[in-house]
Amino acid sequence: MPITVTRESLNTKSIHNNPSYVDKDNIQTLVSSEKPMPTVDINHLRLHEGKGFYYNKLYPDSAKLASGASIDVAIAFASGVYAHLHEDVETGGDAEFYIYSGSVVTGGTSVPALNRNFNSSNTSQSAILLNPTVTTLGTEKYASFIPGGTGGASAGAGGRSFQFVLAPLTTYLFRLTNVNGAAHMAHIILTWYE
């Protein structure tokens, strides 16, 4: 039979030391055969805790990203929030992807971050603007070329596994630009936990 330990007992001296963990309800739980130590990766754990978020912008086949056009997503996090972020970008043709920090932006469309745990009511401590006016790009932190190929069988790509830890109170600009010469489907997905 598992034993659940309340927080008040953490200061009690005991002869036995048993591993324990704090669950999503902030209850200290002793490890046992019925309650094994969770061993999921941190991203998976944050997802179940309701601390994983995402933002996605898609230019579908019916409304392709024009040649020379960009998807600009500006994001900043509240004081004390060091978001661990992963980006995923894909496009149907040649494209360039950049990340800038210390960007200065105005206007744009305020968009919500969505919780990746659809059962959680937790909200992100972020502010996101889609396609704002960029007055200062800031410092380039990352740059990547997404090759699309040539001819009728050309196709873009993406899907790296780069991850970043973002500083609080700093505006970051994520820019995906279609450099193919023709309109193409494109998307940018930002996922993070706080």
Task: Report residues per predicted region.
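Beta-sandwich interaction modules
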Residues: 145-169
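Internal, hydrophobic beta-strand segments that form the core of beta-sheet-rich folds
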Residues: 166-178
